[in-house]
Amino acid sequence: ERYLLNEVNTKIRLIRSRDNFCLMSTGQFKVKIMAASLLVRKVKVSPSVFLAHAKTLEKSLAKYPVRRVVCKTFTIPNGHLDATNEKLFTGQLPRRIVIGMVDNEAFNGAFGHNPFNFKHFSLNEIALYLDGQPHGIKPLAMNFAAHQFIHAYQGLFTGTGKENRDEGNCISRTDFENGYALYAFDLSPDLGEDDHFNLTRQGGVRVDLKFTDALPNTVTVIAYAEFENVIEIDRNRNVVFDFGL
């Protein structure tokens, strides 16, 4: 963690969800915010440190490594047995991707549906391709009807840097097939979950999905991706970044 320099113009924008998205009920209820407060911690540094920072900024920029998060969605109509998104991500390749699927009605907001109920929809194969090359030795295969999905479940640990560590993710194997079917992929070159950043790579990400049974209703696919970027600040407090890649 790094503290933000003083006198840097900072804006925070909060966008709340619709009532029919954040509430589950049988009636038409609504959320009314009566008051809200944002608490921000401020650190006061010693004068010697402040002067040292000012002197350093005369020769170089302050650099802040950040993990940028981008979420993309696409829909699969009911009755389909497979789906492909050729341009899931283009430009800078993400470090990590997590894919989940929910009912389209729940995603758009419905009081009787849970938008965080990530069903498996009888998915039997999911594959990622980077610039046309498959990620991994073979596609991730599973058979939920026979409760055979351990490789996909293990991906929640290998894809998030929790494998071989004395910590979990609060999702059990039983939970995975009952509303927590999330498919994680580590796309970093060294497959390491450390504090270091890797070299930026450019390309495109494609995803292929295959289902055992035809989809009973329209499904929304949600792709969560993490990118490694750097924010730079000069002595005049000008902020420089390039998130377009």
Where does each model-flagged region fall?
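Flexible assembly/topogenesis modules
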Residues: 1-245
